[in-house]
């Protein structure tokens, strides 16, 4: 939507300066193969569907009432699955909302917060929105995070692990190095993709009072359409997040989302099976693309980051779209020759590979 300068006179000065996050395309055309926003190619657990139907058919009258502001049942399910105390769990309307509360709760300090120069592009948006000072730390020549760069003075650290869009993961030992180097500020590990092969930092929670781990049900649990995210930390940090939440939106998760997420956490076998299917498909996709001449960064996510020395990435993305396949292209320095490709089903991945082989390369 185009807004004139005259119309912008009603906007606050801060909003006029905002550079909002640009979400991945959600196409209106139904027959496109969508490999651009890292959604799970498989449906959620059948128990999730049953739980949502039960809310509609057995608790319809309760829809006139507000949901549990604390989402107690969901916190209990997460705590049980993660083997932690309920007081160490915070939930929100997707991990993006949880991250926003994290920025507000912990990062308004005199020193800049640190995060990689190539990472989740919501971080600079939140920093601008909340007036947080920032310092972007360059990835090394292999697009890896060098944890030694995070030992300088700062007002907080946030790292996506595995990183996005590069898909490369840090080890737990490397995460501990960051925590030990920053005992007086909060270190946030954003684990949106951790269930596809990386090591979770949740196991470190009780050892580090400055650690916050943020996760989501959107990727590995196939619940992107319901918006459920959560943070895990020691209770004194959770209390700060609860204070921010209750100053912003006391009822962030609706009854359907609570019921669905609880059911997902209770079906661990289905969760593990689907994650393994994605991992297996990812490894095959990497092999197939490598045979076509792509260089693929080592992935621990449900997507890959790939470049081809003989073909411009932007043109490849456009040609794929013309063939009905959408991937994510970032026209940004250092990564403007890479494509981020969501791992689909084996059939979807085969279509991508065959299209590249027969019609494009």
From Swiss-Prot:
Family to which the UniProt record says this protein belongs: Belongs to the class-II pyridoxal-phosphate-dependent aminotransferase family. Histidinol-phosphate aminotransferase subfamily.
Pathway: Amino-acid biosynthesis; L-histidine biosynthesis; L-histidine from 5-phospho-alpha-D-ribose 1-diphosphate: step 7/9
Sorted UniProt keywords: Amino-acid biosynthesis, Aminotransferase, Histidine biosynthesis, Pyridoxal phosphate, Transferase
SUPFAM superfamilies assigned to the protein according to its UniProt record, in alphabetical order: PLP-dependent transferases
Catalysed transformations (reactions): L-histidinol phosphate + 2-oxoglutarate = 3-(imidazol-4-yl)-2-oxopropyl phosphate + L-glutamate
Entry-linked HAMAP family: HisC_aminotrans_2 (MF_01023)
Enzyme class: transferase
Gene3D superfamilies xref list: Aspartate Aminotransferase, domain 1, Type I PLP-dependent aspartate aminotransferase-like (Major domain)
EC number, UniProt record: 2.6.1.9
GO MF term set: histidinol-phosphate transaminase activity; pyridoxal phosphate binding
InterPro entries: Aminotransferase_I/II_large (IPR004839), HisP_aminotrans (IPR005861), HistidinolP_aminotransfase (IPR050106), PyrdxlP-dep_Trfase (IPR015424), PyrdxlP-dep_Trfase_major (IPR015421), PyrdxlP-dep_Trfase_small (IPR015422)
Protein's GO biological process: L-histidine biosynthetic process
Pfam families noted in UniProt: Aminotran_1_2
Domain of life: Bacteria
Lineage start: Bacteria, Pseudomonadati, Pseudomonadota, Gammaproteobacteria, Moraxellales
Named cofactor requirement(s): pyridoxal 5'-phosphate
Name of the molecule in the record: Histidinol-phosphate aminotransferase
Sites of N6-(pyridoxal phosphate)lysine modification: 219
Coiled-coil stretches: none
NCBIfam families named among the record's database cross-references: hisC (TIGR01141)
Subunit structure of this chain's protein: Homodimer.
């Amino acid at each position: 939507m185009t807004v004139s300068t005259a119309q912008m006179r009603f906007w606050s000065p801060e909003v006029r300066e905002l550079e909002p996050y640009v979400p991945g395309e959600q196409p209106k055309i139904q027959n496109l193969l969508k490999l651009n926003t890292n959604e799970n190619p498989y449906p959620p657990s059948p128990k999730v569907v049953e739980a949502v139907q039960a809310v509609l058919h057995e608790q319809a009258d309760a829809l006139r009432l507000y949901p549990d502001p604390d989402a107690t049942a969901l916190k209990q399910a997460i705590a049980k699955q993660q083997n932690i105390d309920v007081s160490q769990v915070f939930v929100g309307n997707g991990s993006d909302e949880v991250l926003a509360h994290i920025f507000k709760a912990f990062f308004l300090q005199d020193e800049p917060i640190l995060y990689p120069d190539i990472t989740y592009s919501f971080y600079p948006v939140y920093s601008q929105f909340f007036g947080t000072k920032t310092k972007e730390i360059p990835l090394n020549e292999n697009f890896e995070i060098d944890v030694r760069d995070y030992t300088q003075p700062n007002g907080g650290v946030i790292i996506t692990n595995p990183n996005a869009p590069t898909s490369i993961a840090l080890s737990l030992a490397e995460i501990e190095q960051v925590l030990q180097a920053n005992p007086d500020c909060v270190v946030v590990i954003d684990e949106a993709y951790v269930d596809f092969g990386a090591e979770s930092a949740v196991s470190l929670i009780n050892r580090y009072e400055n650690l916050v781990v943020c996760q989501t049900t959107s990727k590995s649990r196939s619940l992107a359409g319901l918006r459920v995210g959560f943070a895990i930390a020691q209770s004194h940090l959770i209390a700060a997040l609860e204070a921010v939440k209750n100053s912003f939106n006391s009822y962030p998760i609706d009854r359907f989302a609570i019921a669905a997420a609880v059911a997902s956490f209770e079906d661990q076998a289905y969760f593990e099976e689907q994650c393994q299917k994605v991992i297996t498909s990812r490894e095959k996709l990497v092999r197939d693309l490598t045979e076509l001449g792509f260089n693929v960064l080592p992935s621990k996510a449900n997507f890959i980051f790939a470049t081809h020395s003989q073909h411009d990435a932007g043109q490849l993305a456009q040609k794929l779209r013309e063939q009905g396949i959408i991937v994510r292209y970032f026209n940004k320095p250092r990564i403007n020759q890479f494509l981020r490709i969501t791992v689909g089903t084996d059939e979807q991945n085969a279509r991508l590979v065959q299209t590249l082989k027969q019609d494009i390369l």
